[in-house]
Amino acid sequence: TIRTQVRAQRAFLGRAVRYLTRDAGIRQYLDIGTGIPSAGNVHDVAQEVAPQSRVLYVDNDPIVLAHARALMAGTAEGPVAFIQADLREPEAILSDPAVAGTLDLAQPVGLVLIGVMHHLRDDDDPRRIVATLVDALAPGSYLVLSQSTPDFDPDAMRALAAASEQGGIPNVPRSLADTEPFFAGLELVEPGLVPMATWRPDPDAEQDPRSVYAYGGVARKP
């Protein structure tokens, strides 16, 4: 179900951001495609480890941003900011004054693209979009990315995608081979680009990894 996929995305986000904050020393995040706030947002996870962590949230939905502004607050030492912008226009995101006001792009950043890549059609040139964002970041930055896929259960994924498209929301699942290029030039962190639920799973994880129709990976910019 869609709920299963969303819950799995949120769990992957938590594991990845915890790893980056605790083990990789990342203290600032750019989260694009934020979605409606719920428990375990990027700043919740990061600031639990390092209260000074700064987060800039980006979403193209004004309703999402209204909710986010109302519900998501940073700490005194770790500001949180929000901008309305479209992932398909990465240059506009990077040039927004809120980026310079919240993040120091001369220092490593965690770029979070979870549950958003499938909204990009191939003619949006998603590889260029990711590359443009990564190119703007300092060496030592990280990309956290998920991508829905038909590889595990083609029929179920087709049904989910059709339901999404019917509601006017693009949903483009991609194979492993079509997802790998998003990480071009980056160093994948173990265990690599894998079924999302199997990326450093929590010890008590009971979910069948193949019931989550997505790949997930974390990679470092050298």
Model-found features: residue ranges?
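Short alpha-helix
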Residues: 169-193
